[in-house]
Amino acid sequence: MIEISGLTKTLYGGGHKVEILKSIGLTIPSGQFIAITGHSGSGKTTLLSLIAGLDNPSQGTIKIDGQDITKLNEDELALLRGKRFGFIFQNFHLIPTLTALENVVLSAELNNTPGATKKSEDLLGIVGLGDRQHHYPAQLSGGEQQRLSLARAFVNEPNIILADEPTGNLDSKNSNRIIELIRELHRVKQATIILVTHEPQVAKQSQRILTLEDGKIIDDQINREL
C-alpha cells in the first residue's frame, strides 16, 4: 500500500515561490491500477517522481507498506527502486548495443533476479517479441521498443510500476497495444500500477482515475466502466 500525506513540493527562483504540489493526500491499495491525469503543469510527473524517490518533497510523507521513503538516504532509495519498482517512460531508454533479450536480462542481473534469462524470454513472449529477442533496438519499431520497455519493467517482479506517458510517442494502434499489455501484465503480475497520462482514452483503461489541477487533486473516482 502507498500512503501519501500532506505532500507538498515548492520551488523557488527569481524571488518567486511556486507550489508544484499542494498538500496531496492519497492512499493507493496494493495491486491497484491508477491513472493520474491533468493538464500540462498540473503536477502529474512531479508526483510520480516523488513516489519513486527521485526527488525530495518540501513537506509531507510517502509510505510504502508502512515505510516512509522520505526518510531514506540515496543508497537506501536506490536499493528500494531496484527491488520494488519498475519504470516505463515515454522515451524508451534502451541500450542500443544490446539485443532485446540482453536489455531485459541486464535489468534482471543488475538486481540479482534469479533465472534472469528464462524470465526475460518469457516476458518477451508475453509482449509479442519472442521472435525478435535477438534484434537490436534500432531494428524495432517504436511500438516494439515500448513493448521491450514493458518486459524490462516487469522482469524483476516489482510491486510497483510507475509509467510516465508510456504511449506519448506512439500512434493510436500501438498506443492501444501497449495499454492492453499493461492491463494483461497487471492481471498476471498483480503489481500496483501508477500511470501518468494526458490522454482520456488511456486513463479509462485503469481501475481508478485521479485528476490533478494546479498541484491539487480535484477528482478521484473508481472507473465503473471496467
Model-derived features with residue positions:
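H-loop (His-switch) and adjacent beta-strand-loop-beta switch element
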Residues: I209-Q221
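ABC family nucleotide-binding domain
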Residues: I2-L212
